[in-house]
Amino acid sequence: MARHIEATGFDNLWLTESSLHARDPYQLLALAARATTQLRLGTAVTNPVTRHPALTAVAAATLAEIAGDRAVLGIGAGDRPLMALGAKPARLAELEAAIAAIRRLLAGESVTADEPGFRLVDAHLRFDARADLPVFVSASGPRTLELAGAVADGVILLCGLDPAVVRWALDRVDEGASRAGRPRPHIAIFVYGVIDEDEPAAIAGARSIAAWFPQTAPIYCDLVGLDPEITRAVRESYSGGEFQEAAQAASLLPVSFVQRMAVAGNRDRVTAQLAELQQVGVDSINILPLGDDRMATINAFDECWRRL
């Protein structure tokens, strides 16, 4: 698959680390690095809860030894799949401290830290690592967006596709960057969904990720004007630890909301949405395909991109 993605012309391959819901990303990214020569390879995303920051530094450094400057570390606070481990997403301070510790370890420093979520005692890597390995932060809520603007090399933006909403999110990133006295980092927007000429099928396949927003990032429901009663009902019926398990909650959402928050339509519709995102000012657009035929959506996304 990695070879096909590279041959198709994609620039990035991101793999998730989602506790029990996905295979280990570092092993798969190492295989992808061996099979490709151009693809940028990263986690989207790991977190400081299921993996100690020191072990994340080791894993990222190892990937960089294999993939060279194509390696990227994507990290976030964690999400609902942590529930299966009896854990909760990291608090903002814990995420910020983890990023700082990882960077210091990659730079060859000895690190002692006593943070809310982890401890390090004179810890240092026993091998050389890439101090300049890019760190991308996954963000959706306003405070995490501001943190990403302040400290990240790139932002993995999870906010749907509505241009006004994306601008709102970018403003939060810019606020954080401005306070830190630095330019806006790279903006990598992630869009989930299905591209199919059968639009009802595409909408049905994308409903599950649309239900993620009322549960995890409800501010976007307010920004696009979703009825608060629908938001409440979706939150109450969202029972799965992973968005793919949220079928009952997703069925409550109107089509208009699904198509603003996810890729859910035919090639013409998606091409128009990609053109709007280009105008907003994101640096890269990344598709996370859903549905039964994910490769079909990847290929359709490539067709849409080539129309621009």
Give residue ranges: language-model regions:
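Active-site mouth loops of central-metabolism enzymes
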Residues: 46-53, 129-140, 193-196, 256-268
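Conserved, mostly hydrophobic/aromatic
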Residues: 5, 9, 32, 63, ...
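N-terminal beta1-alpha1-beta2 module of alpha/beta enzyme domains
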Residues: 1-43, 133
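An alpha-helical appendage that flanks or caps ligand/catalytic pockets
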Residues: 88-125, 166-167, 171, 175-279
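Active-site-adjacent beta->alpha loops and helix N-cap segments on the catalytic face
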Residues: 22-31, 161-176, 295-299
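Acidic (Asp/Glu)-rich catalytic clusters
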Residues: 3-7, 29-40, 60-71, 149-150, ...
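Hydrophobic faces of well-ordered beta-strands that scaffold small-molecule active sites
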Residues: 13-15, 41-44, 71-75, 135-138, ...
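Alpha-helix-loop-beta-strand connector modules within alpha/beta enzyme cores
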Residues: 23-46, 50, 98-101, 105, ...
